[in-house]
């Protein structure tokens, strides 16, 4: 919260009656849609309509005919509950739809019928904006703070793309990133993480617009929020501008111009507003925030606007044409000029032009995996993080837009790109491929989303235990179906002496529970190779790659099944004679080798044993039933799972009568070997569990 409340003198538009009519159309469509849905948030659209109108109509470089034009300005509605403001703008400006293959369609992204069915099944106007569902929505928002943090990733992408592809006479990437946010975003910790990093990097193409309306759901912000936001952001190093009244479009224009001329830091525009502007009984109250105004209040508000009181979903004559002649005409001219410039660029820099086109289509360069190593059998082996480092560097040098970093843990997660020319991304070296997120796991994950939404292939790394800090942003990546790569190391009690605070237990099942997220825990170096190959080929799925700190034996693939089995999620690694097992041992990661050692001994005893490596449950569940039954035959009831994590979820595969060797409490601080003995991760314990399962199955 900052500054004084605005006056209630109403609109002070400079352009004329059509501008007020356009602004009030945004307001009334929002009010009517929320009322029709019997749920939603009318107050912020009513307050911020002049702000969004001024930005879109006069400043935003955006062509409604092509909402995925690469050099468009990005607009992020971080306070996603105000979604009707964005939907109304998408409709009135005539934004066209784009399909999942990034093909432009002729139909409107948002029709008036969609607005009338706000928050209803299959309407393009969902309760909160959803990327890929509604064209023109740059990122899914709703959880407060996520949008502004994601916008930092977009601004980093803009800076990197400009540095990578800009050449004398060809400035191809100079887009701005705007994010509209409120008190809720400012209170969420992720916004602080992201704002701090944005200032450090000098992201001058980034503008946050702060709706300072003094109201939250419970009442006035004074109940829980009294900091000076302007001072806080000046402390970060931002340029801070103020607009005393959200209805003053002239002041708004001056603020946006002030952002544009700022070249060394991001900008925060603090806009004082009235939530529920014009509502005679609910303006400036929490009642205007998250519920319909009511029919009578809407009539009175429309009277205040000079609007037909009983008209619903009214778009007056001339409003659509006004937007078409403003943002529509300007955006089309800018896009056409950019397209012509790109064709000239292609003639001079054909290889770079090809890169840009592949990047935009999420395609890969020819021969991108030609340098990927294979690893010989080795009883000592490599830690998952070490083999991953080799594979990642081999791939990244051939995929120029693959970049990333860690939350101050690259020496431990082994994710630093070390080939010639990789470099660090900093304010003074914006073409670097190594990002330094600092100790900001949540912001890192949200920033990765912004990078991916800008068509880069980002990766971020940290310890698996701290994936909890990033979970909100990981979940949004899955909802959006964007190919973000999360590399989580130190994956188990193998962390050893660091103790239970750093030993992940419940994190693996937690990540597996996120729909659409692939969680992969490779068994050895060659499964790591296959994991990276598969990950890079993905276009619409985020991944959590789970890697060990301790060494894992490199399995002899001349004796056991090929690591390419990872692609089906689970595969038979070692089998009984004639492929007819009496007991199945299944595991992920470092515990696969433990099962192989038990297989050797049990086989020598004459037991018919199968070992199944299960690096990715999600991929396995997608396989045809015949494939799944071929790996885990239904008639084999004797089953044992082994994983240094919570046993939660394993009953799906071992059955209610099966055995799961895993963690049922938190770990302890001790050397790894002692912990393995303590918690039963030994060859002898696996063998005993197998024998007990066989005995149980024979009695069944």
Q: Predicted regions: what is each one?
A:
Residues 15-16, 33-42, 70-79, 133-145, ...:
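A short glycine/serine-rich beta->alpha loop
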Residues 21, 339-483, 561-573, 579-589, ...:
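Non-catalytic terminal/interface segments that mediate subunit docking, oligomerization
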Residues 25-39, 211-213:
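N-terminal capping segment at the start of a domain
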Residues 37, 73-74, 137-141, 170-188, ...:
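A short, small-residue-rich loop immediately preceding and capping a beta-strand
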Residues 48-201, 416-417, 451:
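Cofactor-binding active-site loop characterized by glycine-rich and histidine/acidic residues
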Residues 70-71, 267-366:
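Terminal amphipathic helices with adjacent charged low-complexity linkers/tails
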Residues 111, 117-140, 156, 160-174, ...:
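Thiamine diphosphate
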